[in-house]
């Protein structure tokens, strides 16, 4: 068995085309284009690269993006003031606080300070609570991007045993909520999980989001499983790896995402979707 490839780039282009068309329709009605404020703290090269990629994606679909670059020495109260300013700005429909933040800043406090209806990352407790209640509003970008990508398989997810490896607030936990919403039976594995291999072997849908290359051995993968690799590690300037060895895993899976080119493009595409949704709430 050789797995079919879940191409995140192709799927993301479909999402972006829909967003672009909806923005064109807004403009035809004389309504403003969606506006996104991105707050970038410090000089982390990876964060700067991600923000530049998001800027280009916004420009391609017609979203106005403004990047506020803050020094690494900024205080939490100063950063809170910038968020408050964006909250008040009627031309800003979405706010993205680029993570990670410097160690002296409590990111949870600041994420909660963003207005829920401008929280295009979907991290505010209000938006997570809506997801818990099965009444989603703005949804966390990576998990929802994965769900959109899964529609490309045309597989019925109801009743499938989904195993998530990783329990972060950004991916693992909201991913579990999305899969419950899709009527999967969900197991979440984390650092204290015993017999990780046995859990993975039972997965009909496997989602791995740890950031440790090779943490999942290919022989653990159930033949015919759908495999989603959210991991992203830069091993060298020209080499990127996921959490699973793609070449060996694709011989067991029915569908598999590559790294790069799998989940990453879907995260950005979902951010654009969320920004449009936030703008439509205002307009």
From Swiss-Prot:
KW NADP (keyword) present: yes
GO molecular function, one term: methenyltetrahydrofolate cyclohydrolase activity
CDD domains (UniProt xref): NAD_bind_m-THF_DH_Cyclohyd (cd01080)
EC assignment: 1.5.1.5, 3.5.4.9
Transmembrane segments: none
Reactions accelerated catalytically: (6R)-5,10-methylene-5,6,7,8-tetrahydrofolate + NADP(+) = (6R)-5,10-methenyltetrahydrofolate + NADPH; (6R)-5,10-methenyltetrahydrofolate + H2O = (6R)-10-formyltetrahydrofolate + H(+)
UniProt superkingdom: Bacteria
Alphabetized Gene3D superfamilies for the sequence: Leucine Dehydrogenase, chain A, domain 1, NAD(P)-binding Rossmann-like Domain
SUPFAM superfamilies recorded: Aminoacid dehydrogenase-like, N-terminal domain, NAD(P)-binding Rossmann-fold domains
BP term (GO), one: tetrahydrofolate interconversion
Pathway assignment: One-carbon metabolism; tetrahydrofolate interconversion
Keywords: Amino-acid biosynthesis, Histidine biosynthesis, Hydrolase, Methionine biosynthesis, Multifunctional enzyme, NADP, One-carbon metabolism, Oxidoreductase, Purine biosynthesis
InterPro entries, per database record: Aminoacid_DH-like_N_sf, NAD(P)-bd_dom_sf, THF_DH/CycHdrlase, THF_DH/CycHdrlase_cat_dom, THF_DH/CycHdrlase_CS, THF_DH/CycHdrlase_NAD-bd_dom
One GO cellular component, as annotated: cytosol
The keyword Hydrolase is annotated on this UniProt entry: yes
List of residues binding NADP(+): 166-168
Subunit structure: Homodimer.
Family from the record: Belongs to the tetrahydrofolate dehydrogenase/cyclohydrolase family.
Its biological purpose: Catalyzes the oxidation of 5,10-methylenetetrahydrofolate to 5,10-methenyltetrahydrofolate and then the hydrolysis of 5,10-methenyltetrahydrofolate to 10-formyltetrahydrofolate.
Name of the protein: Bifunctional protein FolD
Gene giving rise to this polypeptide: folD
